[in-house]
């Protein structure tokens, strides 16, 4: 209770699995029973193309949480940008009253480890030592490439002429 009050919060929702999934839940979609939400199109691109039912689960549990909590606003991390876009579409397409419209679904910058800039994520906690060492490399390369691109832009180098130097910098 003290930690919640310290951050200006009086309540926290800690639902039990059986409350959220009264018919039970299994990872095998063919065996699932009950109502589920699917956002067609957006859910089947990028990450959804290799995990075809992932966003179905996200959309379903977020819908349930929104129905229980009825938030004025919702906040999602930028590291899961596709998820945030799917949720914005969900909120608009199903005419959610809480939060009322996608303008109240906010995307916040990714929180990163100050040492190596790896995104702080529940999934990243499962990385072994080697994976933990390698994981920040992509973000470092992207930031380096962005720096080169932006530097060339300040020198009025045309976008078409920025590609080669940017790619060379990150290799």
Predicted regions and their residues:
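Nucleotidyltransferase catalytic core that binds NTPs
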Residues: 1-171
């Amino acid at each position: 209770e003290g930690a919640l009050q310290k951050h200006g919060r009086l309540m926290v929702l800690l639902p039990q699995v059986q409350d959220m999934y009264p018919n039970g839940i299994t990872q095998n979609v063919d065996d699932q029973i009950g109502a589920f939400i699917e956002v067609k199109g957006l859910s089947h691109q990028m990450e959804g193309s290799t995990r075809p039912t992932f966003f179905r689960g996200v959309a379903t549990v977020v819908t349930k949480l929104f129905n229980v909590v009825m938030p004025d606003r919702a906040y999602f991390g930028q590291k899961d940008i596709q998820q945030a876009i799917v949720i914005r579409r969900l909120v608009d397409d199903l005419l959610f009253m809480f939060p009322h419209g996608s303008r109240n679904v906010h995307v916040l910058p990714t929180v990163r480890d100050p040492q190596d800039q790896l995104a702080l994520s529940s999934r990243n906690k499962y990385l072994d030592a080697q994976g933990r060492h390698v994981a920040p490399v992509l973000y470092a390369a992207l930031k380096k490439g962005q720096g080169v691109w932006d530097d060339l832009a300040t020198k009025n180098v045309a976008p078409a002429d920025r590609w080669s130097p940017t790619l060379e910098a990150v290799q």
